[in-house]
Amino acid sequence: MQAVDGISFSVKAGETLGVVGESGCGKSTMARCIMRLLDPTGGKVVFDGRDITNLSRAQMRPIRREMMMIFQDPYASLNARKRVGFIVAEALEVHKLGTDAEVKRRVQELLEVVGLNPEHYNRFPHEFSGGQRQRIGVARALAVNPKLIVCDEPVSALDVSVQAQILNLLKDLQEDFGLTYVFIAHDLNVVRHISDRVMVMYLGKVVELAERDRIYAEPKHPYTGALLSAVPIPNPEAGRLRKPVVLEGDVPSPINPPSACRFHPRCPRFHEGHCDVEEPPLYSFSNGHVAACHYPLERWPLTAEEFRTSRDGPTKAKATAEAEA
């Protein structure tokens, strides 16, 4: 079984790459492989020009200062038996970055940066709300001045109003500290708000990658189009006229994935004898926009009938070996 299979992408310094897809598509597994919390069974992970795939624990130690992670559940990701000061300071102490007084001062500065009272240094996690706990998680990730932060659905467990606060905080911190984010989510509105580029995954594969505005205005892969058609829009009249594309069935099991294109059992544009026989490469369209589909969407939006019919036949777009920036 391969939870993540043959994906290739790059992230530029200072940008935010949004990663979307249904539950079980491999987003979190990919994040843990990037962080070397899981060891990939093939391929390689390159960070800042260095292959870190097979580095030992001792060799990874200095690199771990430069890449941190914000976890999904603010209730489970903080040790309930430890005070906030200890939680945020742990990375500083592991890497021996300062005296006790300097560490305490740094932690209090970080709490203030993320919008919490520095005097709450000695409180326990249960004394904070969900949004405040996630701010503590952000402070912990910032403690050692990393270059890259992998955000694994950091707002999915929060109320909508609190989600906006955390997203705005992450954007402000990126501007202030020059951070690079890999931002994983299943909410397309959240991803649109924070991302520079968006990568869509399905059953362990990358099916589309493009600049944010381009992927929302001109999706090429039918799966991306189906996801976008389900996003609520604030115009009631337009919402009544639009008919979401309903995908039949559930995501297949990665233990026994479909042949060729993994989306073909649910795809409205499925062509028997092609989609189930030949796996589509990542076709390159323009401006770094790539999509893995033999019969891509010609324009957007489409009617339900147009969505199910490819008028141009198989794509003549150039295939690319990997999803490049």
Predicted regions and their residues:
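Charged, flexible cofactor/metal-binding loops and thiol motifs
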Residues: 211-319
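ABC transporter nucleotide-binding domains
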Residues: 1-218, 229, 291-292, 297-325
